[in-house]
């Protein structure tokens, strides 16, 4: 049952090499022993890209890679953070005065998001300090949600230190909201799957209210992650937040066109819901109401009957106020068609026809085309990698995560896995020194993993 608390598992640390190594490093760093450990997984989104923040369902699964944190509560009010990776410097601050710097999304700020989210949810003014050592094996900026996994892990760490309880759903909602402290206007998928994931199954994640339903993936095929080795730091770029705003503006213009009260409309799903029509019908409305040419700020103002000042101060966010044009038609087309593909994907998984793998693969291919052409969130390296994956046997391949770099996910018949991995290695990684150096963490088959939990030593 997804509404329960995150699990607590009692373990013999000596029997788990990664926990044991983390315990030893913690002792070396802080001169003491961790009281507990928390892990939160990364995720791969199988289908449903850039639609969670528009109100639509998505189908992700947790990967086996995760963020793992060793924790010791301390009597002082000092929060001390360290990382097993020397690339990420130590950080220390007072637990009662958390400041998150949006301008520089340094690693510790993601921890602070989760910490502050719990603090604000309970309205706490004084929090205990803690020593934390973080160990992550999710490739950063790869589209596998390493940053959200750290936010979720920090939220559960803080909750556990305080001795308080929340359900997985509540934690997911708090962490989704608190990640926005760093300036990323995400929709909640990453945090939801990190908490609600169950081993062996993907999940249909629905929003408002948040709920997760099992999606049984077909036997005889596996999902393979391949990293393009092009990093995209979501919070450090305006691409992502501009797309969020384009979807919001498209929703408002569509609502106005259909005679709806548009002022409070924020998501494309709200327009469909208010009109009470199907996704296919929403695509026809989009064709009728919006044009493919980019909209200037002045044209948007004319469509909505508002002043440029009102658009700038009441609708545009600080990080989109300098944009001169917005592609409303393309973004709405992607969102409504992708939302329909998610439902079709789930239906194929439920019906389990003989050609299920073929059908699911085609939906993934359609998704990538839409991400590339309508949402414009791909890049040449991702497109090349998708083509290579299809050439060597993937029934479907698409970018996963925000895009503009990061990973692809491919649906590969199980009996072709070995030859597929060897061929993709040769075609994409071999011969490129920087890609080859990262390949160990860049090309792997994965299966649905479990969600966030707490480890306590026996």
Curated annotation (Swiss-Prot):
ATP binds at residues 143, 145-146, 233-234. The record marks 43 as: Transition state stabilizer. GO terms for cellular component: cytoplasm. GO terms for molecular function: ATP binding; galactokinase activity; N-acetylgalactosamine kinase activity. SUPFAM superfamilies: GHMP Kinase, C-terminal domain, Ribosomal protein S5 domain 2-like. PROSITE patterns: GALACTOKINASE, GHMP_KINASES_ATP. It holds the Pfam family GHMP_kinases_N. It catalyses: N-acetyl-alpha-D-galactosamine + ATP = N-acetyl-alpha-D-galactosamine 1-phosphate + ADP + H(+). Alpha-D-galactose binds at residues 43, 49-50, 52, 190. Monomer. Belongs to the GHMP kinase family. GalK subfamily. This is N-acetylgalactosamine kinase. The gene is Galk2.
């Amino acid at each position: 049952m997804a509404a329960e608390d995150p699990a607590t598992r009692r373990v013999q640390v000596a029997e788990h090499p990664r926990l044991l190594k983390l315990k030893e490093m913690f002792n070396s760093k802080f001169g003491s022993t961790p009281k507990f450990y928390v892990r939160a997984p990364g995720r791969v989104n199988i289908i449903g890209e850039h639609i969670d923040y528009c109100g639509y369902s998505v189908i992700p699964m947790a990967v086996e890679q995760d963020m793992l944190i060793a924790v010791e509560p301390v009597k002082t009010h000092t929060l001390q953070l360290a990382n097993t990776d020397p690339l990420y410097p130590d950080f220390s601050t007072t637990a009662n005065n958390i400041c998150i710097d949006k301008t520089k999304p340094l690693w510790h700020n993601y921890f602070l998001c989760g910490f502050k989210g719990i603090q604000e949810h309970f309205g706490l003014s004084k929090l205990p300090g803690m020593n934390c050592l973080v160990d992550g094996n999710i490739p950063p900026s790869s589209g596998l949600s390493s940053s959200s996994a750290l936010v979720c892990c920090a939220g559960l760490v803080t909750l556990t230190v305080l001795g308080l309880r929340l359900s997985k759903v509540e934690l997911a909602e708090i962490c989704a909201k608190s990640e926005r402290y760093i300036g990323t206007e995400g929709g909640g998928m990453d945090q939801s799957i990190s908490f609600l994931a169950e081993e062996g199954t993907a999940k249909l994640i629905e929003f408002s209210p948040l709920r997760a339903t099992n999606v049984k993936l077909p036997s005889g095929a596996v999902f393979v992650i391949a990293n393009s080795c092009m990093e995209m730091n979501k919070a450090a770029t305006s691409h992502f937040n501009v797309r969020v705003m384009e979807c919001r503006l498209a929703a408002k213009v569509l609502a106005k066109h259909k005679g709806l009260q548009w002022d409070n409309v924020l998501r494309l799903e709200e327009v469909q819901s208010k009109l009470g029509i199907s996704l296919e019908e929403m695509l026809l409305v989009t064709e009728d109401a919006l044009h493919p040419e980019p909209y200037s700020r002045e044209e948007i103002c004319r469509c909505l009957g508002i002043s440029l000042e009102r658009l700038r101060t009441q609708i545009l966010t600080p990080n989109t106020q300098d944009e001169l044009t917005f592609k409303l038609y393309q973004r709405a087309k992607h969102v409504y068609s992708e939302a329909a593909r998610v439902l079709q994907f789930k239906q194929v998984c439920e019906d389990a026809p003989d050609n299920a793998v073929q059908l699911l693969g085609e939906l993934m291919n359609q998704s990538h085309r839409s991400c590339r052409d309508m949402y414009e969130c791909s890049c040449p390296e991702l497109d090349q990698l998708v083509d290579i994956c299809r050439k060597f046997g993937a029934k479907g391949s698409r970018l996963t995560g925000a895009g503009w770099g990061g990973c692809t996910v491919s649906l590969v018949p199980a009996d072709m896995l070995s030859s597929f991995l060897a061929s993709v290695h040769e075609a994409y990684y071999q011969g490129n020194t920087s890609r080859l150096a990262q390949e160990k963490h860049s090309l792997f088959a994965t299966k649905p993993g479990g969600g966030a939990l707490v480890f306590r030593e026996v």
